[in-house]
């Protein structure tokens, strides 16, 4: 008997939460967990991604959404400062984090607050997909 860990699916696929009970496959994480992030279900049709980007300025972050893929990139401006660390526990490396979005999930905005990048998402259900009442004659 095999046990499947579906937690990687919850972390990188936004808007598929209704389908997770049916899934049996696991998705691999290729970017090693940096930077750390949370995916929050705000309400039935709203999600929020919070990414820890301490040390990055707003100008060093780039967010793009194309088709069903959300890409967040962070690239530090080249600095020629030499530093001597006694201990370095804060990562200063560049990153690229990708999130596969479900159909009908749209990015509504982003803001940077106290080292956390918040990206707000919304599920927009087209009128054609909404249930409609059929009257009986």
From Swiss-Prot:
Gene3D superfamilies, per database record: 2.60.40.790
CDD domains (alphabetical): ACD_IbpA-B_like (cd06470)
Domain of life: Bacteria
Subcellular location field: Cytoplasm
One Gene Ontology CC term in the entry: cytoplasm
Protein's GO biological process: protein stabilization
Major subcellular site: cytoplasm
One Pfam family of this chain: HSP20
This protein's record includes keyword Chaperone: yes
Residue span(s) of domain sHSP: 28-137
Keywords in alphabetical order: Chaperone, Cytoplasm, Stress response
Matches recorded under InterPro entries: A-crystallin/Hsp20_dom, ACD_IbpA/B, HSP20-like_chaperone, HSP20_IbpA
Family designation: Belongs to the small heat shock protein (HSP20) family.
Function, in words: Associates with aggregated proteins, together with IbpB, to stabilize and protect them from irreversible denaturation and extensive proteolysis during heat shock and oxidative stress. Aggregated proteins bound to the IbpAB complex are more efficiently refolded and reactivated by the ATP-dependent chaperone systems ClpB and DnaK/DnaJ/GrpE. Its activity is ATP-independent.
Assembly information from the UniProt record: Monomer. Forms homomultimers of about 100-150 subunits at optimal growth temperatures. Conformation changes to monomers at high temperatures or high ionic concentrations.
Name of the featured protein: Small heat shock protein IbpA
Species per Swiss-Prot/TrEMBL record: Citrobacter koseri (strain ATCC BAA-895 / CDC 4225-83 / SGSC4696)
